[in-house]
């Protein structure tokens, strides 16, 4: 695959956002006006001899003017509603909630521009420009993940990308049985157990050698509905995204085949538990369809030991056990740019801090990247497929998810052709529709991601700096929270962060000193969340905005127990409460890496927390006095 040698040594992230206070607003308007003018000129210059369809007489008619007035009224109403009811997550240091932040100006401009053409990337003939851009984005995804022969594309979101990953795994795992039906010689001498444990590359090699029988083999695969219950278990960590359950339902393997793997005290997959589960099923002759490792879990930002999962697979393969590996890096995928040099080579760990310093990835000389996180990202290239969401850490507008596969030949296991949109065998520069789950899809999304990638190279000189700004901001926030204490209504409330971030997610709880009732602590945190969110009053006037979640026993097992016990609660109390309520922050703001910026907001955040806690306790006291 052709390498990207693009580099921006003097990149200034401040030039790429509209800005907290619209500091670059005029630049945005100038660029947008230029692009709109170019589109209008494009319309006028297409067959200029054609007559105008709308004349001065039309434009001066009462009905025309009335219609324009009505349209303006509707747009005024739209503007008022959006300005009144939207979340101010553009804020540099006020929004500490979901995976939202400033979006890149080039991505916004590209989307605004390309949507004027309304291209549909399902078919090249309806979107030649943006279909080729999406093909290029897919190649860039593959380079980012270290795939020499990979392929990728944009999807609506990470949920669909995960579903597509399971679709690949299901169909590939079923192919050996299909080959046995169509051409037994391809898999001669292999038992059913061996067929269920064939490595993906070996299956792809056999499919490639099936020649004219490929279509017949595909017909006899899992897409026919055969052997779905024979393919085995789909193992996911307890920190899984909820989309995996939906995917198992839709793909047809069933929820009973989805097995949660315990996580450790750092909220990463417990590799020993994973091995035990696999060996237990192997002893019962139940295969493992696949394993999901997460890079940037939704609620903790934890990065599973992908390298350890790969090492386990290599060990088990010697014993005749093999599983498909999918990395759900919807959240953390772009962080791999932190580890790639300008030649797309993975930077040795011993050189990483030096390279980061040379490229101004962090403002302070600290070790923000944990060795185990580095090792996990290095092993990405061993996974068969990876989910990556540009609309998260790619800082592009919704809706833009993505999936990338290790071997471009895998596309043939899920392909469908329709002559009116993508004819089989046609010589088309970007044939997307035949190899994806979705039908119609916005060309503007591809333009948006393409513009972001071409403004910020997917290496340490570009996106690495943006991811680094987020990570450094998260560490500043974590360190700030560690020492916070508040006096409210004669009580002392302390802040207890969950864990040091693997990525940029910071979770914490508020605990009243001396409280030994976990249910009461959960109530406090939920009440605080309500004060600091949309639940209580307009968001536009709130000085500190957060999100929350629950770590509950049905989903997490006892993995939160160590944290709960560190707060002074007993195991009995943990089982009685059944959950711990957490305040959760995805620190995506690109501004909090700067010490001066953070130091401005820190005391104001503390003041806002104090005010919200006072409201919480005032409400409690009022109820008690009624």
UniProtKB/Swiss-Prot annotation:
Changing residue 398 to A: High decrease in catalytic efficiency. The modification N6-(pyridoxal phosphate)lysine is found at residue 392. The keyword Lyase applies. Changing residue 241 to A: Complete loss of catalytic activity. Its cofactor is pyridoxal 5'-phosphate. Pfam families: Pyridoxal_deC, tyr_de_CO2_C. GO terms for biological process: carboxylic acid metabolic process. It catalyses: L-tyrosine + H(+) = tyramine + CO2; L-dopa + H(+) = dopamine + CO2. Homodimer. In gut microbiota this enzyme is in fact exclusively responsible for the decarboxylation of levodopa, and thus reduces in situ levels of levodopa in the treatment of Parkinson's disease. It was shown that abundance of bacterial tyrosine decarboxylase in the proximal small intestine - the primary site of levodopa absorption - contributes to interindividual variation in drug efficacy and can explain the requirement for an increased dosage regimen of levodopa treatment in Parkinson's disease patients. Belongs to the group II decarboxylase family. Tyrosine decarboxylase subfamily. This is L-tyrosine decarboxylase. It comes from Levilactobacillus brevis.
């Amino acid at each position: 695959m052709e390498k990207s040698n693009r580099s921006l040594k003097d990149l200034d992230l401040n030039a790429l956002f509209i800005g907290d206070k619209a500091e670059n607003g005029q630049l945005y308007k100038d660029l947008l006006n230029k692009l709109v003018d170019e589109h209008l000129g494009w319309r006028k210059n297409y067959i200029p001899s054609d007559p105008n369809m709308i004349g001065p007489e039309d434009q001066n008619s009462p009905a025309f003017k009335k219609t324009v007035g009505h349209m303006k009224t509707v747009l005024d109403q739209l503007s008022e509603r959006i300005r009144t009811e939207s979340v101010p997550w553009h804020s540099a240091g006020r929004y500490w909630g979901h995976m939202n932040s400033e979006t890149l100006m080039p991505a916004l401009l590209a989307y605004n521009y390309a949507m004027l053409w309304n291209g549909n990337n399902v078919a090249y003939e309806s979107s030649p420009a943006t279909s080729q851009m999406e093909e290029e984005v897919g190649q860039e995804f593959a380079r980012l993940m270290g795939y020499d022969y990979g392929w990728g594309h944009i999807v609506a979101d990470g949920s669909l990308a995960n579903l597509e990953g399971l679709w690949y795994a299901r169909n590939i795992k079923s192919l050996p049985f299909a080959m046995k039906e169509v051409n037994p010689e391809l898999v001669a001498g292999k038992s059913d157990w061996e067929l269920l444990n064939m490595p993906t590359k070996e299956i792809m090699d056999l499919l490639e050698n099936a020649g004219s029988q490929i279509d017949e083999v595909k017909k006899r695969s899992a897409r026919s509905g055969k052997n779905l219950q024979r393919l085995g278990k789909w193992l996911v960590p307890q920190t899984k995204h909820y989309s995996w359950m939906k995917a198992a339902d839709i793909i047809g393997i069933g929820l009973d085949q989805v097995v949660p793997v315990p996580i450790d005290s750092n909220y990463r997959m417990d590799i020993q538990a994973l091995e035990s589960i696999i060996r237990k099923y192997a002893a019962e002759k139940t295969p493992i369809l696949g394993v999901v490792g997460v890079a940037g879990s939704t609620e903790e930002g934890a990065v599973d030991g992908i390298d350890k999962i790969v090492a386990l697979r290599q060990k088990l393969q010697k014993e005749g056990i093999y599983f498909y590996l999918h990395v759900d890096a919807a959240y953390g995928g772009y962080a791999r740019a932190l580890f790639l040099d300008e030649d797309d080579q993975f930077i040795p760990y011993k050189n990483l801090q030096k390279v980061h310093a040379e490229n101004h990835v962090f403002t302070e000389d600290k070790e923000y990247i944990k060795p185990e996180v580095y090792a996990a990202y290095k092993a990405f290239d061993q996974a068969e497929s990876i989910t990556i969401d540009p609309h998260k850490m790619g800082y592009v507008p919704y809706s833009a998810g993505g999936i990338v596969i290790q071997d471009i030949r895998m596309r043939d296991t899920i392909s469908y052709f329709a002559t009116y949109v993508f004819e089989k065998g046609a010589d088309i520069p970007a044939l997307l529709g035949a190899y994806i789950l979705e039908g119609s899809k916005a060309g503007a999304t591809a333009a948006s991601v393409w513009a972001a990638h071409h403004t910020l190279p997917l290496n340490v000189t570009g996106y690495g700096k943006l991811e680094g700004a987020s990570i450094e901001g998260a560490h500043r926030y974590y360190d700030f929270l560690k020492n916070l204490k508040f006096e409210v209504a004669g009580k002392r409330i302390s802040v207890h962060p969950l864990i040091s971030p693997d990525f940029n997610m910071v979770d914490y709880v508020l605990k009243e000193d001396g409280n030994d009732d976990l249910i009461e602590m959960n109530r406090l945190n939920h009440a605080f969340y309500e004060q600091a969110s949309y639940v209580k009053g307009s968001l536009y006037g709130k000085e500190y905005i957060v999100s929350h979640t629950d770590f509950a026993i049905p989903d997490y097992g006892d993995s939160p127990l160590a944290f709960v016990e560190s707060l002074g609660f007993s195991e009995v109390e943990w089982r009685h409460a059944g959950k711990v309520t957490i305040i959760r922050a995805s620190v995506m703001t690109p501004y909090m890496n700067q010490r001066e910026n953070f130091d401005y907001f820190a005391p104001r955040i503390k003041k806002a927390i104090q005010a919200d806690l006072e409201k919480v306790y005032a409400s409690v006291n009022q109820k008690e006095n009624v």
